[in-house]
Amino acid sequence: MFKSGSGSLKRSGSISSVKSFSGDSEKGLPPISRGSVSITSQNYEPLIVPANSSSFAAASDFVPEKTKSEGNLKNKSSVITGNFESSGPTNAHYNQNADGDRLVENLLLKEIAKGRGPSTSDARHTATDSRLSQEVKQPFSEENAGGNDLNTGRGSHGTGDGIEQYHKSDCEERMSAYHKRVVDTFFKYFEYSAEDGHSTLYSDVAFLFGCGDLDLLVMSRYQEVMTLRARSAIYGIFCYLQALTAYLTYLGAKVGQVIMLDEELEKYEIRLDVAQDDDPIVFQITTGVFTSGVAHDLRKLTQILEAFSLER
């Protein structure tokens, strides 16, 4: 059952680049357009999460501040189109979003301070969120500057030490069991055989940088999932929603459900109950522009949501 009220997660931006809110200051909301997913809450405050991963079409324009007062976006789902099979280094994307990473880090710290973070006895959220994120961010940024190919996890020198050794040996051993289960679930339902010998996983989840333990685990698991590949546009969509779901779950979401709103248009709604004092966050997505794989991948997404729910 979803609770009513207001909460601190009423904000917008991409996972790696929070462009719309900084404290109480609004800078404008990205449009509901190609390459974005709309999110709404029951208090009619629109939230937009643009798909800024390199595997999504970028939204270049911004709508004026008045968008906030235009009402509930519940019936205005986003249509995502574009090429979701991107490969190659994502260095530019990461470097351009350094400020956004810091904003997301600040958001996480605020949530922790309000009791959404490391307060449980089973170590679901560790007290090292900020420290680990900062520890990994600087070395990884330096690797980027040195010419890392993020798609292969190896630097220009070809050793891969910057990602594989640092993340796997130094970070994963300090992660909580809960986060490990989340990441196991994160990858479980989207493992496809690579058709050309490599994976585009990195470009699909690169926007998770700066979010604390979860992004470190995504990084550490990268070397173990090289067979994972974005084989179609519909796969790209659900890889993105999967990552976003994991991110919100990490912040304390009580996972909701996937609802079909319009079978003919293949229009779906994903509801997440964030916290007891918050309205539910509602994702809406219209997948009617695609012709195959929708129902199959939605079943996978539902399984993922259920798995997260069982972990709580």
UniProtKB/Swiss-Prot annotation:
Amino acid composition bias (Low complexity), ranges on this chain: 1-23
Domain of life: Viruses
GO CC terms in record: host cell cytoplasm
Keywords: Host cytoplasm
Subcellular location: Host cytoplasm
Composition skew (Polar residues), residue ranges: 74-97
Composition skew (Basic and acidic residues), residue ranges: 63-73, 122-134
UniProt region (Disordered), positions on chain: 1-37, 63-97, 114-162
Family the entry assigns: Belongs to the phytoreovirus non-structural protein Pns12A family.
Function: Constituent of viral factories.
UniProt-recorded name of the protein: Non-structural protein 12A
